[in-house]
């Protein structure tokens, strides 16, 4: 039987991939990669792009194209068999990457290339790829004595296993709690859309009534609208203690020891490489220059946002007391009374907006925005093999009708699919040795409610923003003009700059001119009425300071956890969290809350000592967008400038240089504060 992963495919043969194909395919690809490395090294100096970088890039590309659908399926269609196969590949991949990173011969080949005459003939992107490779050798311990190199490899392998274990615990804990409600009165206050979804969940399990889960589309409406305080508290407790030693499943999928070990190993790794701690190591590949700069940035922002956050909370407390006689707000009351206050102040709720954002309007509206700014058109293809019938596939064409890239769109929450929204690369753009250009392919994944009762999927405005955000990442990957592996698309882009294109795209969701075609009532097609639009815009910065303070809490917690780690004392995870809450949080939270235990961004994602990137990129995005505000939000020339200077350049140059080329100067904080309505 042929292994579909080992056939030559332009797009992954999803329906044919089975768990038993995974390990053999990855093993074969890794063997080919090793052979490519040995072949290149045996060739000997002098080295050129063609005899060194190109053959390695092609071998790596095959590996990436095999592993990408495996990793993706593990996220969107998890099963015990696939999970086990995926887990078996992690140590193999980690071991390979350490082997390459510590390969003396290969390191010397790259140094020979950089120090030789050929380097001057390379283009900007190629030079950057070579420089990055040399930097990565340093960060893989190339200069260390043998026993330390071996320890580096052990740590790297263990960390990849731990990150995966952490993720599995969060997924299992999230799926491990459900509640069936048979008496509809217990769900008083809940919007029709949430009730329909909960009913559909129950029916899918052949149960009568309403099934609630800890997936965001199920959890949020309960916290926001359900009048039943006891139910809100029960769900809040279950959600905020996932994968921990507390709550309804205490100890069952506990991430405490996993986090402790992850932090200790990261610290040891950083010190092996000569860094003071993991925060220093993390910044070696980022835009920010040193830990102090990051801490100053976060602390300064906290100082500016805190007074306004305190005021916002005081107003909420006063409102809950005056209107509902509530003496003390509990954590599970915040979202509920905030929604009531928002209604009271602006007479608008997310649910009122839902009918105006049916899926086809939101998706086609997004495409229209992209067409107006960049001259890019999306065309759907229905002949592509996908992992679930609901997944769609699109190609992007520019004004010369050239295919620039394509993407899979997977919008709805499902069982066995991890929560959240993300963009990932399926295929990266690169010029092959035979002269052909391989075009980029992306995965865009969200977790929205699917269509029920014959109505189309109806999105909240927040979900529309999420869709635009992920598509911003997608454009960065798909519209790249760089043809060099490793620095095309999102590859090689520093983590604190990678959120710029995504946060930048969100702005159009607030522009009346864009909302005119992003919205349209699912029954009548009429766009968002002016009265609702005005209310929505008025409510835009409702509790903005509280939002920023929450992001600052996450950012400071992550950064200080890594920067202040002391092996003698252990990780001090909860102590650090409580200390930071004292500094920035204004909303009280219970001591039994276990937020870190499901903070996948930093324990199982790429945001370790890097969560500050969201706020950092927010400054860049708001400032970049202010140029559109000055010159016109659909100004094609401004769009072209953003495309030429930022989106198409991938990781081929330093982000600050690219930003300055677009903006004509360094970024300034004012636009972001103004954007959130914060009087700094």
Swiss-Prot record:
Keywords: Hydrolase, Metal-binding, Metalloprotease, Protease, Zinc. It catalyses: Hydrolysis of oligopeptides, with broad specificity. Gly or Ala commonly occur as P1 or P1' residues, but more distant residues are also important, as is shown by the fact that Z-Gly-Pro-Gly-|-Gly-Pro-Ala is cleaved, but not Z-(Gly)(5). The keyword Zinc applies. It comes from the Bacteria. Its EC number is 3.4.24.70. The active site is at 470. Coiled coil: none annotated. Zn(2+) binds at residues 469, 473, 476. Gene3D superfamilies: Collagenase (Catalytic Domain), Endopeptidase. Chain P, domain 1, Neurolysin, domain 3. SUPFAM superfamilies: Metalloproteases ('zincins'), catalytic domain. PANTHER family: PROTEASE M3 THIMET OLIGOPEPTIDASE-RELATED, SACCHAROLYSIN. Belongs to the peptidase M3 family. This is Oligopeptidase A. The gene is prlC.
């Amino acid at each position: 039987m042929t292994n579909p992963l080992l056939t030559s495919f332009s797009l992954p043969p999803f329906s044919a991939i089975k768990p038993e194909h995974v390990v053999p395919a990855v093993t074969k690809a890794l063997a080919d990669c090793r052979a490519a490395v040995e072949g290149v090294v045996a060739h000997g100096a002098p080295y050129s792009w063609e005899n060194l970088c190109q053959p390695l890039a092609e071998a790596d590309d095959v590996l990436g194209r095999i592993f990408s659908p495996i990793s993706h399926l593990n996220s969107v269609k998890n099963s015990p068999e696939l999970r086990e196969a995926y887990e078996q590949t992690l140590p193999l991949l980690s071991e390979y990457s350490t082997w390459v990173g510590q390969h003396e011969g290969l390191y010397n080949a790259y140094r020979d290339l950089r120090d030789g005459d050929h380097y001057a003939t390379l283009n900007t992107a190629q030079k950057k790829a070579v420089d990055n490779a040399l930097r990565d050798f340093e960060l893989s311990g190339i200069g260390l004595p043998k026993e330390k190199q071996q320890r580096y490899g052990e740590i790297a392998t263990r960390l990849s296993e731990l990150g995966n274990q952490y993720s599995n615990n969060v997924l299992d804990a999230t799926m491990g709690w459900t509640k069936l409600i048979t008496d509809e009165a217990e769900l008083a206050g809940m919007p029709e859309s949430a009730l329909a979804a909960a009913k559909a969940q129950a029916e899918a399990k052949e149960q009568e009534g309403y099934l609630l889960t800890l997936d965001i589309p199920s959890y949020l409406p309960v916290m926001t609208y359900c009048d039943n305080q006891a139910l809100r508290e029960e769900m809040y407790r279950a959600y905020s203690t996932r994968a921990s030693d507390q709550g309804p499943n205490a100890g069952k999928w506990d991430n405490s020891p996993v986090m402790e070990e992850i932090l200790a190993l990261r610290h040891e790794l950083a010190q092996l490489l000569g860094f003071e701690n993991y925060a220093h190591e993390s910044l070696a590949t980022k835009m920010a220059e040193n830990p102090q700069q990051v801490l100053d940035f976060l602390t300064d922002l906290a100082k500016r946002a805190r007074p306004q956050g305190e005021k916002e909370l005081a107003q909420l407390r006063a409102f809950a007391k005056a209107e509902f006689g509530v003496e003390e707000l509990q954590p599970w009351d915040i979202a509920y009374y905030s929604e009531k206050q928002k209604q009271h102040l602006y007479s608008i709720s997310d649910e009122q907006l839902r009918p105006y954002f049916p899926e086809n309007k939101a998706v086609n509206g997004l495409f229209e925005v992209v067409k107006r700014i960049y001259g890019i058109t999306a065309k759907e293809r229905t002949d592509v093999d996908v992992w679930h019938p609901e997944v769609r596939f699109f190609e992007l064409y520019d004004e010369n009708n050239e295919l620039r890239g394509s993407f899979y769109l997977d919008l709805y929450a499902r069982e066995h699919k991890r929560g959240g929204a993300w963009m990932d690369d399926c295929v990266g753009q690169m010029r092959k040795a035979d002269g052909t250009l391989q075009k980029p392919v992306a995965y865009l994944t969200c977790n929205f409610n699917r269509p029920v009762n014959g109505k189309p999927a109806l999105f909240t405005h927040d979900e529309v923003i999420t869709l635009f955000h992920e598509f911003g990442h997608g454009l960065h990957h798909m519209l790249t003009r760089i043809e060099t592996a490793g620095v095309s698309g999102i590859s090689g882009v520093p983590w604190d700059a990678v959120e710029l294109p995504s946060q930048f795209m969100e702005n159009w969701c607030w522009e009346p001119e864009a909302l005119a075609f992003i919205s349209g009532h699912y029954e009548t097609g009429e766009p968002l009425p002016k009265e609702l639009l005005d209310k929505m815009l008025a409510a835009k910065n409702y509790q903005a300071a509280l939002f920023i303070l929450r992001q600052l809490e996450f950012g400071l917690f992550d950064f200080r956890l890594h920067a202040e780690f002391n092996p003698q004392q252990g990780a001090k995870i909860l102590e650090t969290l409580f200390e930071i809450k004292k500094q920035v949080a204004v909303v009280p939270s219970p001591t039994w809350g276990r937020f870190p235990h499901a903070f996948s961004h930093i324990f199982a994602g790429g945001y370790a000592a890097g969560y500050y990137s969201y706020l950092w990129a927010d400054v860049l995005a708001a400032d970049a967008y202010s140029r559109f505000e000055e010159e016109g939000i659909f100004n094609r020339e401004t769009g072209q400038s953003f495309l030429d200077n930022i989106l198409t350049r991938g990781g081929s140059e330093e982000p600050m240089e690219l930003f300055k080329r677009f903006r004509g100067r360094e970024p300034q904080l004012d636009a972001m504060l103004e954007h959130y309505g914060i009087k700094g």
